[in-house]
Structures are given as C-alpha cells and as structure tokens.
Amino acid sequence: MGMTIAEKMLAAHSGHDTVVPGQLIECATDWVLCHEITTPAALRMLEERGMDRVFDPQKIVAVPDHSVPAMNIKAAKMYQKLKSWVQEKGIEHFYDVGRGGIAHVVLENTGLMKPGQTLVSGDSHTCNAGALGAFATGVGSTDLAGAIYAGKVWFKVPETMLIRVTGKTNPGVTPKDIVLEVIKQIGADGANYMVMEWVGDYIDQLDMEGRFTLTNMAIEAGGKTGIVAVDDTTRAYMQQRGVSPEQYTEYQSDPDAKYKVVVEIDAAQVEPTVAYPHIPSNGRVAGSDRIRVTHAYVGSCTNGRITDLRDVARILKGRKVAQDVQMIVVPATQAIWKQAAQEGLLEIFVDAGASVSYPSCGACLGMHSGVLGPDDICISSSNRNFVGRMGDPSAQIYLASPATVAASAVEGFIADPRRYDAEGNDLNAAD
C-alpha cells in the first residue's frame, strides 16, 4: 500500500520503511521551536529531574513573541528565563525582541526549516510550517521537554484528509476565505488528529504566503498538521533563502495512498467568509448581516505577512477608519515591518487612522497591545474566536481575511470586500 507525504516523513524519521495510521512511533525531530510562554514549564520539568541538557543547540530555534516587549513583571521573568537558557546552552538561533517577531513567521523566512523535515513546538499553530512540505506540529510542555532533551517525540501516526481545491477564486476572495470555507464544511473537529493535505490546481498556483495561511489553521479543524507538497513555488521560495534542492528531501504522496476523507472545493464558489462567534467553523458570507464593529485587527501568524498588509493598504489608501472603530495593524516580523515601511504601507495605515504595532502575538490571544473589553466586537484576521480569546469573555470575535477586516474598519460594520476593486476603488461609490 502506498503512503501519504506525512506517512513517508514519519517513517523516515522513525527508522521504518513504512508506517500506517494508528501506529505508535518514536520520531526524531529536526527542529524544536521555543517561545517564552510554554518553554519555561518544559525547562522546569527537566531541571527538577536533573535532566537539564539540550540534545543539540544547533537544532533549537528560540523566539520570544507572545508577551514581548514585556507588559508586566511576570512576562519579564518568562522572557528572562528563555534568554538565560539560550545563553547558557549556546543556542545560536535566537531571534530576540527587535530582531524577530512572531515565531512561526520568523521560522518560515529563515531558511532553517526545510522541506521533508520535522518540527515540534509548544504552540498549536506550529502546523504553519507544513506549507514547506514538512511535518510540523504543536505539542504540550511535557513532550516539548522530551524533544529538547532527546530530540525525539512519540507520535501516533495520523490519518490524512485530502483537500482538493480546484479552479480560480473570484476577486476579493483570498486563501483565508478558502480555509474558513473548508472548516465551515467539515466542522471544528472535522479533521481531528488528521493531516490536512492540500492539493489541486488552485493550490498549484498559490504563493507561499497563501499556503502558510492554509496550513496554519489546520488546528482550527482539529488537525494534527497541514501539508502542501513541494513544487516549483516551494523550491523558488527556498532558493530565495539560500537553500538549494540538494539540501532537503522532497516527499510526494503515492497514487495509491489511503485517505480517511476527501474534501472537494470549487474555488469559484467560495465567497468572502467570516467566522462568527465563538468557533472558526461558524462561517457566513461577509456582509450578509449588518454587524457593527468596535475593533479591527490585522496580524497574527495567520495573516500578518506582506501580502496581507498590501491587501489592507489597497482598501485603506485615501480612506479613513470609521470614527468608532479602533484598528490595529501588526506586521508579523521585523523584516515585514521594515518592508511595509519601505513600500509606504505603514504611512497609508497611519493616515487612515490605524495604529501600527510592533510584531508580537499580544492582541491575538488577549495578552497585551489590543486586549478587548466588555462587549467589544472585533473583526480579526487571526485564527481563533473562542470565548475570551482576545480579552473579556463578553467580547465577540469575527474571523476574516485582511481585506474583509480593512473594508469593515472603513465602513464600521462587517463588510464585503468585493465592493472594492483591485485598485481599491469603491464600486458602489455612486450609490
């Protein structure tokens, strides 16, 4: 029987010729990604057991991103713990405040993580890196401790869901809308402990930024990870980061690979989608209800990339954020922040009345720099809209594409971005 991409990677990293879903394996990890929130707990476990070592300091990437710059003393102590450990263990791949940004987006841009490799991190959106044709997944602090100490993790080989997206999207429809549509169709647990493998001619023509958005949200359907097979787009992306095809292994699913579920999506039928509170699967067409918003947030590891910021600038240029809306734009990394500045995007945001913040996860999980208060209503380009996710439990979070967030910020209500053409012109201006 043939194997899927994920099964081939797990077999190669566990010393097996083949693996099957449900099989328990001990899997070698090529990389361990650490941030300041979950890593200290893992380090305490190791210290308490006299196992305070690192399996390979060259295979650990550390990026403080959730609570930085520190907003209180507790956050400062977590940051200090991570940084002192990095210095003590000689971990070179450390992207400090002012040099990094959101860990998942930092990692995807470094060229360190390569196709065919494995990655674990104490963060559920580690699946982001699956767009590189890699196996990347989040783990708890106990497994994170094991990975730091031994470079290995126990896995149950997951089943795979094949998601075939064909055709072309209509103007105003983005990869975020595609993934929200998929989650709407299969449910928030529809891919529970499965690999979500993305294929189809829509995927073939999609840039890497869009692919990262798709794999990033695998966990929002319960997925173990998301994966896109390596192709010319992947190879070009790696080449731009100084990595040649000789430096990594490509895996493709066999023609007779077995899939648990096959989902078919016609891209032309997908509309701008908004996930209503309080679950990402609660998708509806953008603008179908007149819902006032008090906050608009663009950022996160899902949609804080330069292409996302360009979509936002296209709509905000020459316009103002509605008077009663607080809009925050967070470039995902320092490099993206700098590029956005060079392209004049930040000036557009500021002129429109948006606040441009430093790269961090702060607002996304209600930790700092954009926490929602009682009864606030936020439209967000992030990945989760659970009760209390971004602040007060009474606040409501609507998930959408950056373009939909921008259109909604301007109009003060959840809006359909299709009323703005490719140049940002309002097609309904004459109404």
UniProtKB/Swiss-Prot annotation:
EC number(s) recorded for this UniProt protein: 4.2.1.33
CDD domains reported in the protein's UniProt record: IPMI (cd01583)
Cofactors (names): [4Fe-4S] cluster
Enzyme class of the recorded protein, top EC level: lyase
GO molecular function: 3-isopropylmalate dehydratase activity; 4 iron, 4 sulfur cluster binding; metal ion binding
Cofactor: binding comment: Binds 1 [4Fe-4S] cluster per subunit.
Top-rank lineage group of the source organism: Bacteria
Annotated residues for binding of [4Fe-4S] cluster: 301, 361, 364
Keywords (A to Z) from UniProt: 4Fe-4S, Amino-acid biosynthesis, Branched-chain amino acid biosynthesis, Iron, Iron-sulfur, Leucine biosynthesis, Lyase, Metal-binding
Catalytic activity as recorded in UniProt: (2R,3S)-3-isopropylmalate = (2S)-2-isopropylmalate
Pathway terms, separated by semicolons: Amino-acid biosynthesis; L-leucine biosynthesis; L-leucine from 3-methyl-2-oxobutanoate: step 2/4
Biological processes per GO annotation: L-leucine biosynthetic process
Family indicated by similarity: Belongs to the aconitase/IPM isomerase family. LeuC type 2 subfamily.
Role, per record: Catalyzes the isomerization between 2-isopropylmalate and 3-isopropylmalate, via the formation of 2-isopropylmaleate.
PANTHER family per UniProt: 3-ISOPROPYLMALATE DEHYDRATASE LARGE SUBUNIT 2 (PTHR43822:SF16), HOMOACONITASE, MITOCHONDRIAL-RELATED (PTHR43822)
Subunit (UniProt): Heterodimer of LeuC and LeuD.
Protein name: 3-isopropylmalate dehydratase large subunit 2
Species of the source: Deinococcus radiodurans (strain ATCC 13939 / DSM 20539 / JCM 16871 / CCUG 27074 / LMG 4051 / NBRC 15346 / NCIMB 9279 / VKM B-1422 / R1)
Taxonomic placement: Bacteria, Thermotogati, Deinococcota, Deinococci, Deinococcales
